[in-house]
């Protein structure tokens, strides 16, 4: 197994190097071409400047977060040719028209398979308008209904969720769907892989999706062949190619498992050793997961099938994947799985978090590996705190990306000055993404408090209301606060001019990180 891991790393380093080198050559060649043309032709120089100005005006007029516009406008004005090229590569979602239409067609095909749960929304409204409004937004703006008749268990430790997941996989009778940002063909996945192989031999349909960038360095290029040789259908989302690719900035960050359309898992952990503290690259790794059983799993099934067919359209009849559920839940309360798509204009992940803050009356607690947020999100945090809500955010004590960590800390001062309390997870790196408010509502999923998750990636989460698991999330936060170091006062103090300027620059370009 160790030799396989070394081979995977070596293979991935080679792929990354060759791909980056070829893309760099293309970009440098284009820039050099324009520079030379500008040098020898005043007309071309004027044309390139005019194009840069038009692009800046177009960016300014786009219906997007203002914090996303500013760094692009500055970059293009400072370096017209290179700036426009980088923007078209990484920042211009409009170039993905074909991909956007493909996803829209799939959504039109699959959305009718989601049930109309207006009666449940009305029931929630009669019981508690505060949580009903949150559920109403997800249902009517994102298109994912809220369900009752669903049992949900929260796992504050990723390893517990992983073990429960393996036990559930052993019970599969018809199909298994799995979609993950990162898979590492190492110790943690070995046990799960043997279960999947055995299930495939039994005739269970097994499908697996992983993101190419997320899994790079973790698996060999022959991983798909290995899976398919054992009867497992395997697809790679958004393969990295050595050519300028305008879609490569959008990654599949989701974590979904569906078993027979009745049992589902999601949360923060990927299928790699570091998530279960088998390895410790950044101290103790904090992550989480949820297990759901019942009606709400239907939404996870739709999410997976959308991504599966987005990679390659093969399904024409979805009937077999939506069996009639005869399960009767033991718990009361409501569950609402939902997804976020960077190709539409509805920033569901960000809006759900802001709704949690805007509706909170007593407290709102968040944990995130990165804190790179828009002015709108920052305002939601500070307004809640100024209303007297106990607002707290937990970030890592040991970072996985030092530059991003510096950018994360650059947001502390403005938040703590308005009453938000900041805690750093002393034992290591917190990869969990969860929030809870007022003992009524909680969200657990894949969505970080950063621009990549909120604007660029395909994400998913589960909101749940008036469930026992809400108390479980709250208890997890209470335990985490004991393990954390509060840095509120430290970052409330006066900062030097040099530090303030540096942090302003970090925040300015945070949307590009």
Q: What do these predicted regions represent?
A:
Residues 376-378, 405-407, 437, 455:
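Histidine/acidic-residue-rich catalytic or RNA/ligand-binding cores of hydrolases
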Residues 340, 367-368, 395, 425, ...:
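Thr-Gly-centered strand-to-loop micro-motif
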Residues 1-351, 355, 359, 399, ...:
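N-terminal localization/anchoring segments of enzymes in phospholipid and broader phosphate metabolism
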Residues 433:
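Catalytic-core elements of nucleic-acid end-processing and repair enzymes
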Residues 370-391, 396, 401:
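Helical hairpin unit composed of two closely spaced alpha helices linked by a short loop
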Residues 380-384, 410, 478-479:
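Short, solvent-exposed amphipathic alpha-helical segments in soluble enzyme
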